[in-house]
Amino acid sequence: MALLNVDKLSVHFGDESAPFRAVDRISYSVKQGEVVGIVGESGSGKSVSSLAIMGLIDYPGRVMAEKLEFNGQDLQRISEKERRNLVGAEVAMIFQDPMTSLNPCYTVGFQIMEAIKVHQGGNKSTRRQRAIDLLNQVGIPDPASRLDVYPHQLSGGMSQRVMIAMAIACRPKLLIADEPTTALDVTIQAQIIELLLELQQKENMALVLITHDLALVAEAAHKIIVMYAGQVVETGDAHAIFHAPRHPYTQALLRALPEFAQDKERLASLPGVVPGKYDRPNGCLLNPRCPYATDRCRAEEPALNMLADGRQSKCHYPLDDAGRPTL
């Protein structure tokens, strides 16, 4: 049984008669102890879909789904009180920018202990010791003294470690990490990902890694979900997708990586940008940018089809093992 079950999730903004479909009928599941990577450019709907799961989409946003379940609970039907008890305790999220996610007016220790107090209670000394243990667990040196510092006194990497400590304070079953390495240097990025995977294995929690960097999740994730313009365009085993993508967009993301560069002088890029509300093309949303697009692609939206190898691809002409479209 899946821990998280998402079926035809949509998030719309703006006028109901002509909404902007930030997330458009996406479906996926996450099992206990599984690492899932959600990949795509900025504007693909990765973060919005996760905010919808957390119940953090405010008006004028509208969340619709045929099924949105966590651990057997229908997230669309639970009360606000039930959701508050769930979020932060059983489901937690690490946001993109730790420097703006932490409250600058309160010490690091107060913010961690507040999360523990809300969901687990306990006396002040117990909460303080738990906060020290958490900071030690995420690799912050001299954790007892760091409880009394303010966010502005920490580096970006240390701030992100504090955010991770807050997220795992109540031992969640599902942790969503939204671009957890944004604005960090390459060395710190590797340390943060290594830390998240170490915690995931130790606690046997499900981990959803949201990123624009396919290489970041290729080795860490069991399964990869590729999103484009609010839609899922490819899903499947991480190793298989990394070595033989079935969708042109996934192929383009891979070709932009240095290790896949065919031209050693210049990295490949996909021309154009992710379409917004007013420039969404007919047919396949990728067709203006796709080198393989045909008249059929420009007229008819493809379905997300199950392929023979168990993967899914939203393409009329899924790529073969050699990277060529099956025209």
Curated annotation (Swiss-Prot):
Any Gene Ontology biological process: protein transport
UniProt cross-references to SUPFAM superfamilies, sorted A to Z: P-loop containing nucleoside triphosphate hydrolases (SSF52540)
Keywords carried by this UniProt record: ATP-binding, Cell inner membrane, Cell membrane, Membrane, Nucleotide-binding, Peptide transport, Protein transport, Translocase, Transport
SMART domains: AAA
GO molecular function: 4 iron, 4 sulfur cluster binding; ATP binding; ATP hydrolysis activity; heme transmembrane transporter activity
Amino-acid positions noted as binding ATP in the UniProt annotation, renumbered to this chain: G40, E41, S42, G43, S44, G45, K46, S47
Membrane topology recorded in Swiss-Prot or TrEMBL: Peripheral membrane protein
Compartments reported by the entry: Cell inner membrane
Superkingdom assignment: Bacteria
UniProt EC number: 7.4.2.9
Keyword Ion transport assigned: no
Catalytic reaction(s) noted: a dipeptide(out) + ATP + H2O = a dipeptide(in) + ADP + phosphate + H(+)
GO CC entries: ATP-binding cassette (ABC) transporter complex, substrate-binding subunit-containing; membrane; plasma membrane
Residue ranges constituting the ABC transporter domain according to the UniProt record: 4-254
KW Nucleotide-binding (keyword) present: yes
Pfam families linked to this entry: ABC_tran, oligo_HPY
Location, primary (coarse class): membrane
Protein family membership: Belongs to the ABC transporter superfamily.
Record's subunit section: The complex is composed of two ATP-binding proteins (DppD and DppF), two transmembrane proteins (DppB and DppC) and a solute-binding protein (DppA). MppA can replace DppA as binding protein for heme and ALA transport.
Function field: Part of the ABC transporter DppABCDF involved in dipeptide transport. Responsible for energy coupling to the transport system.
Identification of the protein by name: Dipeptide transport ATP-binding protein DppD
Organism in which the protein naturally occurs: Escherichia coli (strain K12)
Gene name in the database record: dppD
